[in-house]
Regions:
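Conserved active-site alpha-helix within GNAT-family acetyltransferase domains
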Residues: 83, 106-128
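A short, internal acetyl-CoA/4′-phosphopantetheine-binding micro-motif in the GNAT/acyltransferase core
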Residues: 70-81, 104-107
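Conserved GNAT acetyl-CoA-binding A-motif
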Residues: 93-107
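Core SAM-dependent methyltransferase catalytic element
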Residues: 139-140
Length: 140
């Protein structure tokens, strides 16, 4: 079930991020915790939960029209959770809005799964970036 994230989800989201932090260039727990709390307060975070297990989470910015984080539990990957979370966020925008996301650069194998997922949802490469000394790619 996908729903808006609540303040009491923060610890589960932190635990999930610890499992997948290597998938996020420049991840820092303190900065993530602060950003997560702000997104929850603004209604800009969703979680996918099955019984007591947090399967995935997504955060976004209405102002920037961007997905800012998307994480799926390693045991729940390839089940369509990321796609459902992306489409849930897309439903928060107007159809003509262009939503962006940043992931690892095209030549970085750490971003292969994420890029495939984003592309299956209609995202296309727009520009190459560097974040925290890591080559990345912006998709829209």
């Amino acid at each position: 079930m996908i729903r808006h994230a609540k303040p009491e989800d923060a610890d589960s989201c932190i635990h999930l991020m610890k499992l997948v932090k290597n998938d996020f260039p420049g991840y820092r727990e303190d900065a993530f915790r602060t950003a997560l709390q702000e997104m929850i307060e603004r209604g800009e975070a969703f979680v996918s939960q099955d019984d007591d297990m947090l399967e995935g989470m997504v955060g976004f910015s209405r102002e920037k029209k961007a997905l800012t984080m998307l994480a799926v539990h390693p045991d729940c990957r390839r089940e369509g959770i990321a796609t459902r979370l992306i489409y849930t966020v897309a439903g928060c925008f107007e159809p003509e809005d262009e939503i962006s996301v940043i992931t690892f650069a095209e030549n970085d194998p750490r971003g292969e799964a994420a890029r495939a997922c984003y592309r299956s949802c209609g995202f296309e490469a727009e520009e190459d970036l560097e974040i925290s000394n890591v080559e990345c790619q912006k998709l829209v």
